[in-house]
Amino acid sequence: MKKIAKIVLVSFSLLIFIIAVLIFRPVPIVSENKAISESGIVKEIYSNKGNDVIFVMENNERRFYINRGLENGLELNNLKEKLIGNAIVVKYPNYWTPLDWNNSVRHISKVEFNDEILFNELKK
C-alpha cells in the first residue's frame, strides 16, 4: 500500500510541476515569418492595472494585448484617437497556456497601421 501511495504522490507532484511550467513560461518572441497575422477594425482600446494596452476588434471574439504597453511608451489617448474605427494588422506568436485555454486573449508582438509600425517586439 505504501508503494502505491508513493507512486500516486510522485505522479501528482510531476503533474503539478508540468502545469506550473506551462502556466509560468514566458510568451515566446518569434520572428515575423513565424508570427500569426490578423487584421480588423479597432472597436475599443483600454488599459488594465498591469499597464497592458488591450485592443478589441469588430467581429472578433478575441482580445489582443500589448504587455505593459503604457510602460513602454505607448499613449492610450493617442492610440484611441488614431486607431478606433480604423483597420490595423496585429501579429502574435502561436502559443498555448492553461490560463487561456481557448486562446481568447492574444499577446501582440507587432501592430501595423497604414504602413506604420506602432509597436514591434518581433525577432529581427
PLM regions: where:
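OB-fold/S1-family single-stranded nucleic acid-binding modules
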Residues: 94-123
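A short, sequence-level motif marking secondary-structure junctions
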Residues: 66-73, 123-124
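Positively charged n-region of N-terminal signal peptides that target proteins for export
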Residues: 1-4
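Structural detector for short beta-strands of small beta-barrel domains
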Residues: 31-50
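Short nucleic-acid-contacting surface segments enriched for D/E, G, S/T with interspersed K/R
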Residues: 73-91
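Hydrophobic membrane-insertion alpha-helices, especially the h-region
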Residues: 6-23
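OB-fold (S1/OB) nucleic-acid-binding surfaces
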Residues: 49-69
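Short boundary/loop segments of OB/S1/cold-shock single-stranded nucleic-acid-binding domains
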Residues: 19-36
